[in-house]
Amino acid sequence: MPKPEPRPLRTLPERAFHARARLVAALMCCVCFAGLAARLAYLQLFAGGWYTNRALGQQLRDTVVPADRGRIYSDDGVLLAANSSCWTLRASPREMPEEKLSLAAQGLAEILELDEAKLLEKFSDRTSNDCLLRYRVERDTADRVRDFCEENGITGIRINQDSKRGYPEGEFLASVLGFTNVDNAGVSGLELKYNDVLTGQNGVVLTAVNAWGYTLEQSYETEKVPLEGSGLRLTVDANIQHYLENALDYAVKEHHVAARAVGIVMDVNTGAVLAMSTTPAYDPNQPRVIYDAAARKAVDALTGSERAAALQLAQQTQWRNKAVSDLYEPGSVFKLITCAAALDAGAVSKNSTFYCGESISVAGTRFHCANHKRHGSQTVTQALENSCNQSFIQIGARLGKEAFCDYFAAFGLREPTGVDLPAEPKKSLYYTADRMGPVELASCAFGQSSKISYMEMAAAVCAVVNGGRLMQPYLVSDILNPDGSILQHTEPVCRRQVIKPETSETMREMMEAVVLYGGGRNARIQGYRVGGKSGTSQKLDSADEKARIASFVAVAPIDDPQFLCLVCLDEPHSWTTAGGSLSAPVCAEVLEQTLVYKGVPRAVEPETDPDPAQTAADLPADGDSFDGA
């Protein structure tokens, strides 16, 4: 047998080449192995959670169970806002029997008042596993759908429990409560201001599904129970609120008020708001329906984009709480502030005398009293009774612009009141001392040329009569746990001392004189001592030169102040625009009912003989007017 030929020896370069090849191969294997190891480590250590969640997402379907918002109660326990159960209907077309799609569309369209053709089109999309049928239906509708599906063997229809906000009292306190949107989030009023407090924690139901998205047996479900939000107990008393709303409703209709009316009732010693109304109101259960007949008629007369814009404006107008959000010229009611400031600063006493002739000239501008009335020589008390512009121009001049502006700020008229409602203006419109000349000081002294909020005016008058303390207005007395126990209580807050207690006492005497002898006689209440002040202010920024705001503020009992009522009728069209004639009777009606309801006993009335300087046939014509710029 022949011997095999010997293998030729490799040369040195060949051996080096093969060695390098083996080394490269080994390195490549190491790199690949390291890459796989790194990928595995990444998946195990870092991406595991993501893949787990993705797998669960394919295996589980989560359904949110909305939590109820907290309830809102009046101070006397009337339920004002609460959630009620409802049901949202959805369908999974891929789970519905194909041979029953037409039957399902026909039956559900009839029950839910939907278009049958559109419903059948939805059901025919076999790739869909979720489509909305009807949002938030009542129990009887949900029961009819359930019975129909069970009787006809129709699967794939889901009836999910839901929750919706409701207001059992309808229009009652609407501008204060506000309303919520379709997601149960606050849009306005207390619902918006306390949205985080009222909002609960949603629950969830996890349902297992198979690879095709079909729901498995209910034994695979797990549930996280929703938690109800915290509730609110208001300072508002439902009875006093009814007194105010009823009186305002009548006044608005009787005097043809064009730009809505405002009413506020407060506890003068704590700042608690006992009632607040902007009239006409709206129903927060249907907030997008225009309830003012004139506004609705104006909107309906338009078409297209003009109608849409007008509708939006009308809705925003009716939602706005005028008592808090609007600024206005306070008119002669503001004379209480000028008078209190001048007395407190020592610029005048209640017996200081001033002369009122046909008119008074200030830096070339002539001012006169309403109807060009001449009051002659009178004390400060009589000037307040007569609502005399000329006298208050002189009082303002004695006080001086620096002191006037200081007291204006001290009474809280240059800053928000801090009331717990949204949309309060950040500042009012006013003159600072460096921009105030003699004419501006003159007009500001009797209540024109400045614009403040109704809430600011009410809080300031509370300070005038309660001993001089400026209290922060508030509407929520308690935040409640879902079981009704108190989670947080609101204590009254005194912002500062504005005037001396003795000044406040003098002002109470003078305000009572206004009701007994002056332009506030229509605010008198048998058996109760009342103090007040009227106002009839020009709307200087209105295109209508005759536009007026008729207002009156009253406090009772004036010898032991407890309740304040401010009523303002914006643009009344009646036999007069005088606040002492139109608004004072509203205040009297509301306060009398409130005093009786609160158990304040009637007392023997003091003598009410006419003031020596005033006779019944010579009542002051309340109003504010001037000539010139």
What is each model feature region?
Residues 1-302, 318, 327, 402-412, ...:
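Periplasmic/cell-envelope proteins involved in peptidoglycan metabolism and beta-lactam response
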Residues 2-7, 81, 210-222, 269-333, ...:
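Beta-lactam-recognizing serine transpeptidase/beta-lactamase-like catalytic domain environment
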